[in-house]
Design a protein with these regions (language model features):
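Conserved hydrophobic "DFG−1" position in protein kinase catalytic cores
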Residues: 13-14, 21, 89-91, 107
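Conserved N-terminal beta-strand and adjoining loop/helix that marks the start
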Residues: 1-19, 40
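Active-site-adjacent beta-strand/loop module that shapes the phosphate/pyrophosphate-binding cleft
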Residues: 62-64, 72-95, 106
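NUDIX/MutT-family hydrolases
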Residues: 86-88, 97-129
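Conserved Nudix-box catalytic region and its N-terminal flanking loop in Nudix hydrolases
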Residues: 18-57
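Short secondary-structure boundary/capping segments
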Residues: 3, 11, 26, 76-79, ...
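Generic C-terminal helix-cap and adjacent flexible tail
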Residues: 1-3, 130-136
Length: 136
């Protein structure tokens, strides 16, 4: 049996000293939890293109991807593996997040990351960010 690989991209948008986070809306798995906005890669799509598409669809937000900061394999099983790509991006001039799927968003400083109820799958990356920014 062939193992299913599901790839997901998450945006790391750092603007004016704060990181963009979005809350999962009601009706979706893990509703109310916070995450870095993004979504699944479509067949043949790069992480950068998926990031641009997902942020446009979910937040009406135009960004320019830079580079992959972190990659994480989550919950590997014999049947399925989830790969998270955390991609740094910066907003296009004049673009601001406007949620399209009834979710909330917020901007947090690296020192505020522990105050946000993140999805468990994002926690390793949150710890990496805290270390990178010297947050204890």
């Amino acid at each position: 049996m062939k193992k299913e690989i599901v790839e997901v991209v998450a945006a790391v948008v750092f603007d004016r000293g704060k990181l963009l986070c979005s809350q999962r809306p009601e009706g979706k798995a893990h509703a109310g939890k916070w995450e870095f906005p993004g979504g699944k890669l479509e067949k043949g799509e790069t992480a950068a293109l998926a990031l641009m598409r997902e942020l446009a669809e979910e937040l009406n937000y135009r960004v320019n991807p830079l580079d992959e900061m972190y990659r994480l394999a989550v919950h590997p099983t014999p049947e399925r593996e989830l790969i998270l790509h955390f991609v740094r991006a910066y907003p296009e001039s004049g673009s601001f997040p406007e949620p399209c799927e009834n979710q909330q968003f917020c901007w947090v400083t690296p020192t505020e990351l522990d105050q946000v109820d993140f999805l468990s799958t994002d926690q390793e990356f949150v710890d990496f960010l805290k270390m990178a920014y010297g947050v204890k």
